């Protein structure tokens, strides 16, 4: 079954929409003729974006299942249903293992993984009833290739990719489309505010503009494409990793050494 979905006229939720990729997605959906409700935890920035784009907004912490249920209920009331759920909210994390706390792990797991699970759990019943629906789950190239130094980010983004795969396998023949967004460096506050070593790493193949990533998302939905890899080199890296895992590990170890030689002040991030 093909789950190609024309975006025009569709009812869309975008989380993490106050800035960056989420805001750019919202703009692209609106330009394509969709109706959008935007969500973010940053109420001030969210209000500004909602006013600029003339859309409804919901302030929420997407790591909360109750909050996701309210987002869906409120959006159903205002839009008359949901066709596309873009689970885009995410948090970074530059620490390694030894300096992270239980609270750190629970926070990043809640936002980067559980928000996707809650969105699917509570959107699927109505999507299955209407025999159509689409999820765009934002992960990262780090979920496919691991990000040096960032234990929590790498682990949770890998889990996000795995959940998106499971969702596509389980519901793809039941009218539900799934795309998993896995960019490298994108010009967002998360990248621009990151330590120098992180910016150097994620920008190794160039920094993309959010609008270009958002355009890739629209194209993926309208062609029922699972993996969205805006940076084409990511696909080459995946092939290299699959062909010789040990060589790939050795290459990543060498890259880590090179980065630490250039940014010795960041050594604690790699423990």
Describe these PLM feature segments.
Residues 44, 60-70, 102:
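The beta1-alpha1 cofactor-binding region of Rossmann-like NAD(H)/NADP(H)-dependent oxidoreductases
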Residues 120, 156:
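Active-site helix of classical SDR
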Residues 96-97, 104-109:
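Substrate-binding pocket helix/loop in short-chain dehydrogenase/reductase
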Residues 199, 204-207, 211-271:
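C-terminal tail/cap regions
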Residues 32, 145, 166-176:
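Active-site-adjacent segment of SDR/Rossmann-fold oxidoreductases
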Residues 140:
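Residue(s) in the substrate-gating loop at a strand-loop-helix junction
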Residues 11, 18-19:
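Conserved glycine-rich cofactor-binding loop
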């Amino acid at each position: 079954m093909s789950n190609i979905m024309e975006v025009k006229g569709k009812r869309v939720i975008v989380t993490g929409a106050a800035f960056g990729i989420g805001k750019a997605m919202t703009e692209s959906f609106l330009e394509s003729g969709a109706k959008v409700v935007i969500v973010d935890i940053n109420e001030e920035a969210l209000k500004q974006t909602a006013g600029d784009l003339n859309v409804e907004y919901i302030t929420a912490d997407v790591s909360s299942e109750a909050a996701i249920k309210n987002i869906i209920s409120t959006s159903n009331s205002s839009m008359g249903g949901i066709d596309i759920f873009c689970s885009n909210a995410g948090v970074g994390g530059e620490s390694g293992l030894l300096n992270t706390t239980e609270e750190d792990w629970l926070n990043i797991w809640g936002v980067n993984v559980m928000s996707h699970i809650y969105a699917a759990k509570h959107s699927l019943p109505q999507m299955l009833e209407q025999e159509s629906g689409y999820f765009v789950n934002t992960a990262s190239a780090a979920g496919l290739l691991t990000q040096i130094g960032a234990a929590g980010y790498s682990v949770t983004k890998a889990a996000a990719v795995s959940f998106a795969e499971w969702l596509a396998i389980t519901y793809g023949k039941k009218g539900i489309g799934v795309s998993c967004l896995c960019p490298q460096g994108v010009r967002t506050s998360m990248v621009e505010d990151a330590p120098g070593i992180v910016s150097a790493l994620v920008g190794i193949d160039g920094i993309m503009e959010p609008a270009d990533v958002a355009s890739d998302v629209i194209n993926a939905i309208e062609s029922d494409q699972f993996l969205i890899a805006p940076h084409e080199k990511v696909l080459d890296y995946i092939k290299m990793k699959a062909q010789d895992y040990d060589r790939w590990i050795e290459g990543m170890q060498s890259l880590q050494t090179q980065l630490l030689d250039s940014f010795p002040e960041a050594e604690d991030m790699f423990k």
